[in-house]
């Protein structure tokens, strides 16, 4: 599977019932969007394996899924906690100024004074805006280990260059 780049979009939870259904935890922005991205791959024993979605539905407020070949509780239990991934090629193209989180992780962050703030390790959703979690360089002049920088395009984030994996921000290095 070396030619494919897989992105995690969710995770299987515990079994539901005796007919092979599993709870599903979607990490897509809109919960049901996970079903728009097909085919799915499950990470089993460290390897991505294709899997076919047979059916899905809501049970109370939870999503539950039925996967092909998972016809009883025992076979479903083998898939519990498996990550769900999709090939990056199934994601739609974004407009200028919009980015997928996986594109931003690993980017070097520099401020307008050319100070290297560190590397984006993850993003957080706060409700009002996304936040870059930046691991500071080991010899940070301000003694920082981590910085939280709001991803406010044009206000704070001045430029994103995915070709060079750099994000330029208007942010004081002391914060």
UniProtKB/Swiss-Prot annotation:
<comment type="function">
    <text>An accessory protein needed during the final step in the assembly of 30S ribosomal subunit, possibly for assembly of the head region. Essential for efficient processing of 16S rRNA. May be needed both before and after RbfA during the maturation of 16S rRNA. It has affinity for free ribosomal 30S subunits but not for 70S ribosomes.</text>
</comment>
<dbReference type="GO" id="GO:0006364">
    <property type="term" value="P:rRNA processing"/>
</dbReference>
<keyword id="KW-0698">rRNA processing</keyword>
<dbReference type="Pfam" id="PF24986">
    <property type="entry name" value="PRC_RimM"/>
</dbReference>
<dbReference type="GO" id="GO:0042274">
    <property type="term" value="P:ribosomal small subunit biogenesis"/>
</dbReference>
<keyword id="KW-0143">Chaperone</keyword>
<dbReference type="GO" id="GO:0005840">
    <property type="term" value="C:ribosome"/>
</dbReference>
<dbReference type="GO" id="GO:0005737">
    <property type="term" value="C:cytoplasm"/>
</dbReference>
<dbReference type="Pfam" id="PF01782">
    <property type="entry name" value="RimM"/>
</dbReference>
<keyword id="KW-0690">Ribosome biogenesis</keyword>
<dbReference type="GO" id="GO:0043022">
    <property type="term" value="F:ribosome binding"/>
</dbReference>
<dbReference type="InterPro" id="IPR036976">
    <property type="entry name" value="RimM_N_sf"/>
</dbReference>
<dbReference type="InterPro" id="IPR011961">
    <property type="entry name" value="RimM"/>
</dbReference>
<dbReference type="InterPro" id="IPR009000">
    <property type="entry name" value="Transl_B-barrel_sf"/>
</dbReference>
<dbReference type="InterPro" id="IPR011033">
    <property type="entry name" value="PRC_barrel-like_sf"/>
</dbReference>
<comment type="subunit">
    <text>Binds ribosomal protein uS19.</text>
</comment>
<dbReference type="InterPro" id="IPR056792">
    <property type="entry name" value="PRC_RimM"/>
</dbReference>
<dbReference type="InterPro" id="IPR002676">
    <property type="entry name" value="RimM_N"/>
</dbReference>
<protein>
    <recommendedName>
        <fullName>Ribosome maturation factor RimM</fullName>
    </recommendedName>
</protein>
<comment type="similarity">
    <text>Belongs to the RimM family.</text>
</comment>
<keyword id="KW-0963">Cytoplasm</keyword>
<feature type="domain" description="PRC barrel">
    <location>
        <begin position="96"/>
        <end position="175"/>
    </location>
</feature>
């Amino acid at each position: 599977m070396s030619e494919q780049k897989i992105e995690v979009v969710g995770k299987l939870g515990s079994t539901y019932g005796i007919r092979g259904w599993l709870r599903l935890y979607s990490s897509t922005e809109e919960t049901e969007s996970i079903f728009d991205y097909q085919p799915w791959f499950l990470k089993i024993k460290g390897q991505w394996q294709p899997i076919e979605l047979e059916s899905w539905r809501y049970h109370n407020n939870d999503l539950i899924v039925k996967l092909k070949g998972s016809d009883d509780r025992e076979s479903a239990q083998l898939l519990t906690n498996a990550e769900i991934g999709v090939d990056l090629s199934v994601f739609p193209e974004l407009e200028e100024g919009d980015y997928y989180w996986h594109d931003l992780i690993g980017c070097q962050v520099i401020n307008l004074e050319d100070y290297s703030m560190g590397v984006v390790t993850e993003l957080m959703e706060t409700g009002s805006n996304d936040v870059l979690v930046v691991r500071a360089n080991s010899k940070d002049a301000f003694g920082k280990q981590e910085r939280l920088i709001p991803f406010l395009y044009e206000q704070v984030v001045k430029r994103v260059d995915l070709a060079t994996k750099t994000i330029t921000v208007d942010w004081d290095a002391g914060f």
